[in-house]
Every structure is written in structure tokens, then in C-alpha cells.
């Protein structure tokens, strides 16, 4: 099993693949909803006067989603014509950007969760990080996140080829396939989300001791972002783990068929995750529409910072 149909950074690329029509629909919806939605989030964060750490981290998260969705038209073309006819350079570029954005997204979500935990468990630290150094801290953390993600995404170029009209992963050995799949699953999904889950388990105990409704609203927002990422990327990483199990069993059999059939729709679902966050922010901000005319998302997160510091 030296090659696999696709990876974290590409939806299914041939209309003959089962589920390709579903993938085409999901991708079109993601681009149509996600690009303007994330652009609005970026504008909302840019015009706010109080640029707290959560606001700045969410702006970088929206930027990662925009990077992913800007590659959507290339994949839509490939899906519509049934082949990849745009050359190896665009194949590499699209997959590299999307793989990097995947890592950036999950790392920033983990940082958001960590900041939320600190805001509740260490209110004094929340006050400090909400001060004049907030921008430097957030942009520094985001820059480090992007740098690490760009390095981790290199395998998406190394193991990517255009063969028989398809831009797909090709591994020279099964060991490289196992390495690639486990790298994505552990560092791009399981480890960061496990850390957030543990931190939030402790945070829930703290929240039960407070009556601050606004803090609960922000808590639910961040939880929704975490859960949305975990759910939309879960099937993709499950397919990756199935491929690893197939290699361990010597290849072939029903499990390999299931892994190959699961990968295309699972990858399309993962791509859709880039369009979900703006919808979650909109739902979380519904209760803040009355009052000042400032942006809802920054205002929601500012309330969170104030609540964390007044415990």
C-alpha cells in the first residue's frame, strides 16, 4: 500500500471516486460560506480597539481558514473535470498550504483553550495578558505556530505526485505511509485536542463555582470551536489510522477497501470545517446585538477577559 488516495489538504480529485459528488457539493458550500464569513471575522478583529489575546488568536485562525478556502477553486476545477490538469507546482502549492493551515488551526485552537483555562484558574495572569503586551504575546505565539506548521507540512510536498491525471499521495515504502499518517493524526489532531480536553475538564470545575453568565457564553463558544474541529476532522484521521492498520496486517482485505472508500468523503468533511467557525461566532454573538455598535466577536471576547479578571 505505497500510495493513498488523498491527504489532509485535498478533497477527492476524481468524479469517478464514490462520494465525489458529495465532496464537490461540500467544497462549494465551504468556499461560498467560508470565504466571506472568515473575511468578516478578520475585519471585525481588525477594527476593534481592544485587541486581546483571544481576538488576535481568532484572527489568525480565520486567516488559516481563508488560506485553505482560497485553494478551493483549484479543487473544484479538478472535481468538475475529473482530473488534475494544473501541473505539479499547483498540486504541491495547494496541498502544502492546506496542510500547514490544518496544523495552524488545531494549534491555535489549543492556545485558545489554554488561554481560557488561565483566564479562569489564574485571573491575575489574565489581567496581565490583557494589557499592553497582549498583541506582542498573541502575534509571537501565532508566528511560532505558523513556523512550526510550515515545517510539519513539508511531507505534503515530498509525498505528492501527479499520476494518471490525479494529484495524490505516493509513498515509496509502507513505513513512510505510516510515518505520514501518524504525524498528521497525532500532532494535527489527537495530541492538541487531548490537551484541550484535559484542560477543559479542569476548567468545568471552576466554571461551576461562578455565576458569571458571560463567561459561560464564551466558554461554550470555545468548546463549540474545539468540538467542531474534532468532529469534522475525526473521520479523516480515522481513515488514516485504518490505513496504518492495513499496513500492519500486510495489506489487502475488507479493511483496505473501507479505508479507501472512507477517505474521499472524510476529507471533504474536513475541508468544510474552515467554514464553520464564523457561523459559531455569529450564534455566540446573538445576545450582544443590542448595546454598542462595536463588533460582536471582539466584544464577546472582551467580556470574557473582564469576567476572568473579576473572579
Predicted regions and their residues:
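Alpha-helical transmembrane segments of integral membrane proteins
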Residues: 19-23, 56, 137-141, 180, ...
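Seventh transmembrane helix
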Residues: 231-240, 261-311
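Extracellular TM2-ECL1-early TM3 structural module of rhodopsin-like
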Residues: 19-24, 28, 51-112, 118-130
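Hydrophobic/aromatic residues in alpha-helical transmembrane segments
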Residues: 38-41, 72, 106-113, 153, ...
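Alpha-helical transmembrane segments of multi-pass membrane proteins
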Residues: 31, 60-72, 141-153, 185-193, ...
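First transmembrane helix
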Residues: 18-48, 67, 194-200
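Residue-level signal for short hydrophobic patches within transmembrane helices
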Residues: 21-33, 56-59, 63, 97, ...
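Loop architecture of class A 7-transmembrane GPCRs
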Residues: 2-14, 79, 83-103, 121-122, ...
Amino acid at each position: 500500500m505505497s500510495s493513498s488516495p488523498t491527504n489532509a489538504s485535498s478533497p477527492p480529485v476524481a468524479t469517478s471516486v464514490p462520494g465525489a459528488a458529495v465532496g464537490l457539493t461540500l467544497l462549494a458550500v465551504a468556499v461560498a460560506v467560508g470565504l466571506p464569513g472568515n473575511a468578516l471575522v478578520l475585519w471585525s478583529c481588525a477594527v476593534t480597539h481592544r485587541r486581546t489575546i483571544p481576538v488576535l488568536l481568532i484572527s489568525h485562525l480565520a486567516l488559516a481558514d481563508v488560506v485553505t478556502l482560497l485553494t478551493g477553486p483549484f479543487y473544484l476545477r479538478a472535481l468538475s473535470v475529473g482530473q488534475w490538469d494544473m501541473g505539479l507546482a499547483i498540486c504541491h502549492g495547494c496541498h502544502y498550504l492546506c496542510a500547514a493551515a490544518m496544523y495552524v488551526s488545531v494549534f491555535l485552537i489549543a492556545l485558545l483553550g489554554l488561554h481560557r483555562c488561565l483566564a479562569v484558574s489564574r485571573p491575575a495572569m489574565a489581567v496581565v495578558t490583557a494589557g499592553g503586551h497582549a498583541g506582542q504575546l498573541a502575534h509571537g505565539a501565532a508566528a511560532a505556530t505558523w513556523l512550526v506548521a510550515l515545517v510539519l507540512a513539508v511531507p505534503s510536498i515530498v509525498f505528492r505526485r501527479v499520476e494518471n491525471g490525479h494529484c495524490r499521495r505516493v509513498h515509496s515504502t509502507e513505513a513512510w505511509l505510516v510515518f505520514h499518517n501518524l504525524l498528521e493524526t497525532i500532532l494535527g489532531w489527537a495530541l492538541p485536542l487531548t490537551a484541550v480536553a484535559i484542560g477543559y475538564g479542569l476548567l468545568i470545575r471552576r466554571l461551576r463555582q461562578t455565576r458569571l453568565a458571560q463567561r459561560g457564553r464564551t466558554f461554550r463558544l470555545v468548546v463549540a470551536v474545539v468540538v467542531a474541529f474534532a468532529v469534522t476532522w475525526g473521520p479523516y484521521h480515522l481513515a488514516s489510522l485504518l490505513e496504518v492498520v492495513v499496513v500492519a496486517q500486510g495489506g489487502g482485505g475488507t479493511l483496505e477497501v473501507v479505508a479507501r472508500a472512507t477517505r474521499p468523503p472524510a476529507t471533504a468533511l474536513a475541508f468544510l470545517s474552515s467554514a464553520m467557525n464564523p457561523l459559531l461566532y455569529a450564534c455566540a454573538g446573538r445576545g450582544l446585538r443590542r448595546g454598542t455598535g462595536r463588533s460582536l466577536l471582539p466584544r464577546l471576547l472582551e467580556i470574557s477577559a473582564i469576567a476572568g479578571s473579576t473572579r
